[in-house]
Design a protein with these regions (language model features):
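Ligand-binding pockets and gating/stacking loops
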Residues: 1-307
């Protein structure tokens, strides 16, 4: 949970992970949530043999995998059918736009008495730890640590101060961090909640992020080849940043990609949305494959209601 679970301190957990070689693993997850819940029968699970009032107006096209057909507005993804699987067994039993349900698999009230269920990224951060000083979980969507404790909250980059600047050196930063620990010592003696342990982890994570510069470099798309940026397009920059963050050592990157709540004008909206998703997702699959990251990186694309 927080840093005192099972009698283990955060340092103990990190030490145990190092001994088990957990920290050397480069397995990663890119969790893309299509906020609003895209219509499955108009995207990856078309029903061409159903009656016209059920099947929708889009036609299926064949991918490079025999028997796997997807929407006609996914021509680029159709060339990468061998790089993804369509999972049709997922279902949703909550009739609202609950990102909590998609991120945890449980109702919001589940285990609420002890903090609630943790999201996918928080579980991965707890089990896998960090790599190369990068935060294990970067989340731009609705994610929370639940009963695992505050230390497993997602890291949410905000602002531009992600690198050392001006006269601030690594030594000066270390000195200030040491002073902060001394000042916190008075509070620690009276703390029984684990909050100080969590604060230690936050501080160390912030120091690691600032001193290494890896996360700042990954987030700055000016460091990316312009041809790659053009391939993803402006609409696909979140996908590109996710790939760069994984390369920097982040275990889980989660973000929302909205615009899928199509109660009205479904087909008009999808004709606008689907080509953007086609370009961004196909570019991500292609990139991961070309960079040798495809065997270690899982990409999940989904929305509410089991879609």
């Amino acid at each position: 949970g927080s840093m005192a679970a099972g009698g283990l301190s955060f340092a103990d957990l990190l030490r145990a992970e190092a001994e088990q070689g957990v920290g050397s693993s480069h397995k990663a997850l890119i969790n893309i949530h299509l906020s609003g819940g895209p219509s499955h029968q108009d995207t990856f699970d078309l029903k061409p043999d159903a009656a016209s009032e059920f099947r929708g107006e889009f036609a299926p096209i064949q991918t490079n995998v025999p028997g796997l057909d997807i929407c006609e507005h996914f021509p680029k993804l159709a060339q990468h059918g061998d790089k993804f699987a369509v999972v049709r067994s997922i279902f949703g039993n909550i009739a609202d736009h609950s990102d909590h349900h998609t991120q945890t698999g449980f109702d919001r009230k589940s285990l609420s008495g002890i903090g609630g269920r943790p999201s996918i990224g928080s579980v991965a951060a707890h089990l896998l730890g960090s790599v190369n000083g990068a935060p294990p979980f970067v989340g731009y969507n609705g994610s929370w640590p639940g009963y695992l404790g505050a230390v497993y909250k997602p890291y949410k980059p905000q602002g531009g101060n992600l690198k050392l600047s001006g006269s601030m050196t690594s030594d000066r930063l270390a000195s200030r961090t040491s002073l902060l620990k001394d000042l916190d010592g008075l509070k620690r003696a009276a703390d029984n909640s684990g909050q100080m342990d969590a604060l230690d982890a936050y501080t160390q994570q912030a120091v690691d992020v600032v001193t290494s510069g890896r996360v700042a470099d990954a987030l700055d798309l000016n460091n990316e080849d312009q041809k790659i940026r053009d391939k993803y397009t402006k609409d696909g920059e979140s996908f590109l940043r996710a790939r760069r963050l994984v390369e920097a050592g982040v275990r889980v990157v989660g973000f929302n990609w909205g615009g899928w709540d199509t109660h009205s004008n479904n087909f008009v909206t999808l004709k606008r949305q689907l080509p953007k998703l086609d370009v961004a997702l196909a570019s991500l699959f292609e990139d991961l494959h070309q960079r040798g990251m495809d065997q270690d990186t899982t990409v999940v694309v989904w929305g509410e209601f089991g879609r």
